[in-house]
């Protein structure tokens, strides 16, 4: 099982703790064999659960250039049409340049793969983050925005990684100026929370995913490009 480089420090630390736990188990087995066996089994179980969270399975990215794939594993929780003038994020209002915005929200559980991927080829233009503070009890987030391109048609696209819990941490290795391929890994949300994908509401891109649908990053098709639709 391949483990993500985004969690290398965490799963290496877990492995060191496992080795220490097994050494303790060996000592316990010498004195109280059942207790030592139980401690060893518990150590292996905890280690297995921990490193499984950082798994990075191989994904075959679809070669159909007209398809946009899911940016994260999870459940499509909601879809919302946001009038540009009503959008709370100034960076999104500017990125979408007057166009209304369609937001697709994907929620993640601890059991999902947490590697985030690009839904289509994207040139990154903006990277903005906000940390949770005592004054603001809402979630921390990192927003990545840029220009998506499908069959020589360009359109604004944005991805927002959201961490709700105290243990959740956002990792984003993409930087302004990067040109990322469809399905390219660019980060993760450690211990999970929510991913939001933003697309122009009126565009050549048609949404085919449904709320309640389980999706897989880089694999499940969320939307398709059609030249019959006009921006």
Give the positions of each predicted feature.
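Contiguous, well-folded functional domains in the mature portion of proteins
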Residues: 1-231
